[in-house]
Amino acid sequence: MTDLDICAPSAELQGCLLEHQEELLIHIIQFHDLMNRYESAIKEVYTKLEILKNDFHLHNNRDCITMIQTRIKTPVSILNKLKRKNIPISMESIRTELNDVAGIRVICSFIDDIYMLAEKLRNQDDINIVSIKDYIQNPKPNGYRSYHMIMEVPVFFRRQKST
């Protein structure tokens, strides 16, 4: 095998990339915009949780939340999940078919705190609860216990509002 043989596929790939560079750039920009929306939504919910935590501490002299962790799925993880579920790879599919691109894990001091916090979030006018899975009341067969809320929150950008 010569250096030329190794470079041939690379040159072919470069030609393909050059031919479709504008389209690729548009998709990259759209993906970054979508991830920015998820990051912004996480900031909105994180702020709500911090406010509730501080308010609870002020009025009850204890913390109901011991930890808040946030995460955004990586592009590779998003792609793998779309492929695994046989979902078309598109921005629209990410937005409409995946409900775990962004996530917040909240660790509470007591189980009652979880339900109190969930109720406080449900009562906020700008939060739309999409679904709830209560694995505390109904643990999984393997013993997993948790409370999952999937929600939509509005995020206000320079030119538009997004959920």
Question: Which residues does each PLM region occupy?
Answer:
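Solvent-exposed, flexible loop/coil residues
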Residues: 82, 105, 139-140
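Charge-rich, low-complexity segments
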Residues: 1-97
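A broad, low-specificity signal marking well-ordered, structured residues that form hydrophobic/aromatic
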Residues: 49, 104, 147
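Short flexible coil/turn linkers enriched for glycine and charged/polar residues
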Residues: 98-100, 143
